């Protein structure tokens, strides 16, 4: 895949970029490693916080310009692109304010371990490679960059090949915010370069957000090198609605949860599991609202759904829907790519889906909603968990017992009750099953790339350092 900005609304190639050479890659790794050796010791939390806040200031001041760039590169609506830029600023501010506290020494009961003092100290690992996707060109990378930099790590970003301008902008804005040269670099390289970078002994760890095959590849390399990783992979999130829910609010939120980011979000709701008593009403209302959405030019403020980011992505969801309908599923609306230039696919609703269909088993990365009828809460949870994925989940009910049941039994990294799954700097983010492992954001995210070092200090008179001959 070429490294290029291709406007998904027109299919026009706007700008192409020359990949970094092997020598340039080596120089970037060397620069990052040398910077880390100094940065981890010579900067304080207060200094890093000043730079993080300055970066946030720039993101806010340049939000309109940045939004236009993201919309051009991957087709998200201008309003959602601006919201993403502002969210990135919020992420930097969160870690500027909280990093020192989140990484403070954690005292242990020294007496119980025979020490004068004992605690856990969090220290940065070093150079972290980030392999990031195109769907949230800035936010996905900032979720790694802000905590990593505040912890004292440095970063190398290998971004998706179709968002090179976004990738270059992020490295530039972080440097303009005051972080020293080499703290955060973008390398415009193909996916084939990832293995070479990750195997370099100067690179300490990796984080990847992307497809399951990409995650498997990075995990295999990192495992061979014994390097820690965080993987945030695909999702096929359930959106469950029970009879006690506020039906109109649930429908409204469900539509937003499905078409956010033109339907291209790992945590978008994709499978709508509705109690049989309200199923028909819910589906009718949902279809009505999906039909009312405006599809078109993502720079038009009136547009609700823009194009898919890539032609192959558009073709893949079209095939998933076509195959399901051919196998007996019912198409309630949408279902055919729009005529004309660009990679547009309309909001689509499919019912009567069976277990042998790709819509049942695969992630659908576009504005396609799959509907399922559940007889009771047991069947709703069974359908929700009948997937290899476990990223986010949503459940709508005003029954306290049902809420607790969903919290306890849904197999996912996140459960949102009477809302839609959203990433917040203040909340840990990640999945289970084939949605990956490790966590981003909040305290979990900043500690993900730290060495949790156990410190045991005996008294100067102690002859039993570390507990002597006690069993490990």
Swiss-Prot record:
Binding, NADP(+): 134-135, 158-161, 210-211, 233, 363
Family, similarity comment: Belongs to the aldehyde dehydrogenase family.
Protein known as: Succinate-semialdehyde dehydrogenase [NADP(+)]
InterPro entries reported for this sequence: Ald_DH/histidinol_DH (IPR016161), Ald_DH_C (IPR016163), Ald_DH_CS_CYS (IPR016160), Ald_DH_N (IPR016162), Aldehyde_DH_dom (IPR015590), ALDH_GabD1-like (IPR044148), GABD/Sad-like (IPR047110)
Gene label: gabD1
Native source species: Mycobacterium avium (strain 104)
PANTHER family: SUCCINATE SEMIALDEHYDE DEHYDROGENASE [NAD(P)+] SAD (PTHR43217:SF1)
GO molecular function: aldehyde dehydrogenase [NAD(P)+] activity; succinate-semialdehyde dehydrogenase (NAD+) activity; succinate-semialdehyde dehydrogenase (NADP+) activity
Signal peptide annotation: none
Keywords, in A-Z order: NADP, Oxidoreductase, Tricarboxylic acid cycle
Keyword Oxidoreductase recorded: yes
Keyword Oxidoreductase (UniProt): yes
GO BP term (any one): tricarboxylic acid cycle
Pfam families: Aldedh (PF00171)
EC number from the UniProt entry: 1.2.1.79
């Amino acid at each position: 895949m070429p490294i290029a900005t291709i406007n998904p609304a027109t299919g026009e190639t706007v700008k192409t970029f020359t990949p970094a050479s092997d020598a340039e890659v080596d120089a970037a790794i060397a620069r990052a490693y040398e910077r880390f050796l100094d940065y981890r010791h010579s900067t304080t939390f207060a200094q890093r916080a000043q730079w993080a806040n300055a970066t946030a200031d720039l993101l806010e001041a340049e939000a309109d310009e940045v939004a236009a760039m993201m919309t051009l590169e991957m087709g998200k609506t201008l309003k959602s692109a601006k919201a993403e830029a502002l969210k990135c600023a919020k992420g930097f501010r969160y870690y500027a304010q909280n990093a020192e506290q989140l990484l403070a020494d954690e005292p242990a009961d020294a007496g119980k371990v025979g020490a004068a003092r004992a605690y856990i100290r969090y220290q940065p690992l070093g150079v972290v490679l980030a392999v990031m996707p195109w769907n949230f060109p800035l936010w996905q990378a900032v979720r790694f960059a802000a905590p990593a930099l505040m912890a004292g790590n440095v970063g190398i970003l290998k971004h998706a090949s179709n968002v090179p301008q976004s990738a270059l902008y992020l490295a530039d804005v972080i440097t303009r915010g005051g972080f020293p040269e080499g703290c955060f670099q973008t390398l415009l390289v193909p996916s084939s370069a990832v293995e070479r970078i990750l195997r370099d002994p100067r690179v300490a760890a990796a984080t990847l957000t992307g497809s399951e095959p990409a995650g498997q590849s990075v995990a295999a390399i990192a495992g061979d090198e014994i390097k820690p990783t965080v993987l945030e992979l695909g999702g096929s999130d359930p959106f469950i609605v029970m009879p006690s829910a506020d039906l109109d609010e649930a429908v409204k939120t469900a539509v937003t949860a499905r078409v956010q980011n033109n339907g291209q979000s790992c945590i978008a709701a994709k499978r709508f599991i509705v109690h049989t008593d309200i199923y028909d009403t819910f589906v009718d209302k949902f279809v009505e609202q999906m039909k009312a959405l405006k599809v078109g030019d993502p720079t038009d403020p009136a547009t609700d759904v823009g194009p898919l980011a890539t032609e192959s992505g558009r073709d893949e969801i079209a095939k998933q829907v076509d195959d399901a309908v051919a196998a007996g599923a019912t198409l309630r609306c949408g279902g055919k790519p729009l005529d004309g230039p660009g990679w547009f696919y309309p909001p689509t609703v499919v019912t009567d889906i069976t277990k042998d269909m790709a819509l049942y088993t695969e992630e659908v990365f576009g504005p396609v909603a799959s509907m399922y009828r559940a007889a009771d809460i047991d069947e709703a949870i069974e359908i929700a968990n009948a997937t290899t994925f476990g990223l986010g989940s949503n459940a709508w009910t005003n029954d306290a017992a049902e809420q607790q049941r969903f919290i306890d039994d849904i197999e996912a990294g996140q459960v949102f009750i009477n809302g839609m799954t959203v990433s917040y700097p203040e909340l840990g983010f990640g999945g289970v099953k084939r949605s990956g492992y490790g966590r981003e954001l909040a305290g979990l995210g900043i500690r993900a790339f730290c060495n949790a070092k156990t410190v045991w200090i005996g008294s100067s008179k102690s002859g039993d350092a570390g507990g002597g001959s006690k069993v490990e």
